A protein has these predicted regions:
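N-terminal pre-domain/capping segments
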Residues: 1-94
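Active-site acidic/histidine proton-transfer and metal-coordination neighborhood
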Residues: 59, 76-161
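Intrinsic, low-complexity polybasic segments
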Residues: 34, 162-163
Length: 163
């Protein structure tokens, strides 16, 4: 395995010269980069047409893909409904990633809210385990879950790993 380098989403520099995300793989290849992270931070809203076209363009330009799941995922929410919704957002992300040929999704874990870090971690581990189990049952075993912290004091982080 080797390190991959590329942006998450499109930069202002990209937007000056290019119009659509489908042009990103060619742009990145020309810059000597080899990866692109498709952003779904505000919800998974990628059509089959765009997903399949991006998959083709990425392959044409030797660019690997990942997908950033929605920012409103909360693996450690005290509300079971929010944790269940988070699982659904993760599954939607797996589906979109699979359609575009991405092999991993990036997931923010959420905050510790009004509970201890230890309790938040236990809730997050349970939620992520249930999400992974369901993803595998739905045929997304090829999608790697990549938990990511946001670097804020109240965010759950530094030791949440899924193996």
């Amino acid at each position: 395995m080797s390190a991959k380098f590329g942006p998450a989403g499109n930069s202002e520099a990209f937007s000056i010269k290019y119009k659509t995300t489908l042009q990103a793989p060619g742009y990145l290849e020309a810059m000597g980069l080899d990866h692109y992270e498709y952003q779904c931070g505000r919800g998974v809203k990628v059509s089959d047409k765009i997903a399949f076209a991006l998959k083709d363009k990425a392959k044409e330009h030797n660019i690997t893909l990942s997908l950033h799941a929605p920012y409103f995922i909360s693996l450690s929410s005290l509300e079971a409904e929010k944790r269940d919704n988070s699982i659904n957002y993760i599954l939607q992300s797996c589906d979109a990633a699979s359609r575009m040929g991405a092999d991993r999704i990036v997931i923010h874990s959420g905050s510790c809210a009004k509970i201890s870090r230890e309790d938040a971690l236990e809730l997050a581990k349970d939620t992520l385990t249930r999400a992974r189990k369901t993803a595998v049952e739905q045929g997304f075993e090829h999608i790697v879950f990549c938990p990511e912290t946001m670097g804020k004091v109240n965010q759950l982080g530094n030791c949440l790993l899924y193996t």
